[in-house]
C-alpha cells in the first residue's frame, strides 16, 4: 500500500474515532451543563469523564493534523 493511501486511511480512522469519543463525552457534558443551569455542584465523576474524553479528542485531533501535514508534503 502506498504511503499516501495509508495516510488517508489513518486520517479517516482518526475522524471516526473522534466522532465516537465525542458521542461518549456528550453524556457527561450534558450532566455538567445541567448542573451549571441548576446552579448545583457538578458530579466529580462527570467532570473526570468529560476531561478524560476531551484529552483523548485533543490528542487524536493533534495526531490527525500531523498526518494531514505529512500527506500534504508528499
Where are these regions (language model features)?
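Generic alpha-helical secondary structure signal
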Residues: 54-57, 67
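Compositionally biased intrinsically disordered low-complexity regions
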Residues: 12-16, 35, 69
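Intrinsically disordered and other compositionally biased segments
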Residues: 8, 25, 56-58, 62, ...
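Long amphipathic alpha-helical coiled-coil segments
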Residues: 34, 61-74
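Short E/K-rich amphipathic alpha-helical oligomerization segments
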Residues: 17-51
Amino acid at each position: 500500500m502506498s504511503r499516501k493511501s495509508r495516510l488517508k486511511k489513518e486520517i479517516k480512522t482518526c475522524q471516526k474515532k473522534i466522532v465516537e469519543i465525542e458521542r461518549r463525552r456528550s453524556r457527561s457534558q450534558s450532566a455538567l451543563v445541567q448542573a451549571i443551569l441548576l446552579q448545583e455542584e457538578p458530579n466529580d465523576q462527570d467532570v473526570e469523564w468529560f476531561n478524560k474524553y476531551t484529552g483523548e479528542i485533543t490528542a487524536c485531533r493533534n495526531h490527525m493534523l500531523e498526518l494531514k501535514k505529512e500527506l500534504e508534503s508528499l
